[in-house]
């Protein structure tokens, strides 16, 4: 289980994002909490590119634009930074994924939109940045138990969403495959995460769309 102090620190940290600020505070400029939110976005980039173990505290202070003292005031250690970063990344990516699959009429179309969500992030510059969850999952055996729990939770959460899309498609008849939704979701997730890995090697969007086309045959 996660260290209680880490959980409490993260909840307190994230709750600051929604706190209202007085006109005087807004007039003085952007509050510190929002600077820390931006700092976590910097941490997402460096952890995604370098991985947990290869990222030093110096890398984090540079990416987050924080002095080392400020970093340790906000977070207990590098592990706490990573856990907070992973949680922020998971929340943001879930919202973006759900938005990407919304608005389509059938489960099949929503499933394809989910695959395209990954294809569009697996080429060019954004592809070379990598995916925080995929990178951490690949390094899971070398991570400690607290971090492994966070990574596993992120992977399983995405798998549940994909399984829901499969089930919706089977219900409306657009997904003709009779495979168990959970099994098909795992296969699709392997394709999605695989695109993020291959995308780090400099592939084109056309390459990734071809993967989507093949993956969707599993649903036919």
What do the predicted segments below correspond to?
Residues 91-94, 109-113, 145-171, 182-183:
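Amphipathic alpha-helical packing segments from all-alpha helical-bundle domains
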């Amino acid at each position: 289980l996660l260290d209680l102090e880490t959980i409490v620190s993260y909840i307190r940290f994230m709750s600051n994002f929604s706190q209202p600020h007085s006109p005087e505070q807004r007039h003085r400029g952007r509050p510190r909490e929002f600077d820390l939110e931006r700092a976590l976005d910097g941490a997402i980039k460096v952890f995604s590119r370098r991985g947990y173990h290869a990222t030093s505290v110096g890398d984090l202070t540079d990416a987050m634009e924080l002095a080392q003292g400020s970093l340790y005031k906000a977070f207990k250690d590098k592990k706490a930074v990573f856990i907070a970063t992973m949680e922020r990344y998971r929340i943001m990516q879930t919202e973006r994924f759900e938005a990407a699959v919304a608005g389509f009429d059938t489960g099949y179309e929503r499933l394809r939109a989910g695959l395209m969500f990954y294809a569009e992030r697996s080429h060019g510059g954004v592809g070379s940045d990598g995916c925080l969850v995929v990178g951490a999952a690949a390094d899971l055996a070398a991570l400690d138990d607290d971090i492994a729990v966070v990574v596993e939770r992120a992977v399983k959460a995405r798998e549940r969403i994909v399984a829901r899309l499969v089930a919706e498609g089977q219900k409306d008849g657009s997904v003709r495959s009779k495979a168990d939704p959970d099994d098909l979701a795992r296969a699709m997730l392997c394709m999605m995460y695989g695109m993020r890995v291959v995308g780090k090697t400099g592939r084109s969007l056309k390459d990734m769309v071809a993967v989507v086309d093949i993956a969707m045959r599993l649903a036919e």
